[in-house]
């Protein structure tokens, strides 16, 4: 058994999730690969596996039960947070992980190939690239935890939206001023997240066109 298996299992249960042993094992394989590649490719500033478990895996898992179903785009995915974690837990969901950083996408593509994952692809491009917009089309859910600015994220997501699409933004503090700027066009539901062993404010913002 993986040394972090029980810790991840207990953490996910505290988040209200009932993940299978297979899903937990896949998540830990992903973390092991991230730790290994991080030594050479600097994929994340977090190097301690125990800290990674909390700040990457559990943090990403904290939004899982609040995400609507459907095809998902993760913008600025970096090393795959939260997109890869969602894909591993929900094999029925089609996921596209998008980032402009070649090293990070190379890591994700290799991991996808090694595990023969069928529901997720990684694409190296900029979110505003018109060819990318034309090729990928529209999504039901668009996630990100990379954008400092909510308005920037909404602007980047806009070409990928259909009428019912949900923008799911992972934030620390609630960006009240930015929400005010967007309220004429988007409804916004704020969900307070409680990540086990993380003593920081975390929120999920679910935005939808009015």
Curated annotation (Swiss-Prot):
Localization: Cytoplasm
Keyword Cytoplasm set for record: yes
EC annotation from Swiss-Prot or TrEMBL: 2.1.1.170
Top EC class for this record: transferase
CC annotations in GO: cytosol
Keywords: Cytoplasm, Methyltransferase, rRNA processing, S-adenosyl-L-methionine, Transferase
Keyword Transferase: yes
Entries under Pfam families matching the protein: GidB
One Gene Ontology term of the molecular function aspect: rRNA (guanine-N7-)-methyltransferase activity
Binding site for S-adenosyl-L-methionine: 76, 81, 127-128, 145
S-S bonds: none
PANTHER family per record: S-ADENOSYL-L-METHIONINE-DEPENDENT METHYLTRANSFERASES SUPERFAMILY PROTEIN (PTHR31760:SF0)
Homology family: Belongs to the methyltransferase superfamily. RNA methyltransferase RsmG family.
Function according to Swiss-Prot or TrEMBL: Specifically methylates the N7 position of guanine in position 527 of 16S rRNA.
Protein name as catalogued: Ribosomal RNA small subunit methyltransferase G
